[in-house]
Amino acid sequence: FQTKPGISVVVGGCIDPDIIVKDEGSYPLAASILRSGAYFKFVQENNDQYASIDEVLADNELMTKFKVFIEENDISGYVDGQEDLKLAKEKLSKKEEKNLFINNAFSVIEKQIEKTQSTMFEDEKEIIQRMVHGEFAFYYNGYEGRYNIYLKDDKVVQKAIEIFADESQYLS
């Protein structure tokens, strides 16, 4: 079935999207930072170092400062199995407190989780930086400033702008 302009309607009555923008994926560290309120806290602790959002955007050391901040505040992303490990360690530690093999096994696993979390920052750096910039933009310029930062890199918004710039695409 098709609508009058020729758009295909799939089973269930939904219209197929003309354009599909790939999902950016999940960001466990960025989400943990957001849930903890750390973006806001970082801005509150550091806003006196900058006179405007332009100074923030020009600071090449900003992400290094933010990484130190989240490490000092013990903010980490969720790694699959992390909670299960914590529960298992609590249960086994009580029973097998002096078992060197179990303690070493937990130590190895915990080091792997720490390694995974440190790579999370690098993997998610772009989205974390966007969030830090957005929070500073909100501090200096309110919601308009925040959305100007967030939307300039948003893939869906960028695709829409691209389509609207080409009249032949959005009128077809």
How would you label these PLM feature ranges?
Residues 1-172:
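Conserved functional hotspot residues or short segments at active or partner-binding sites
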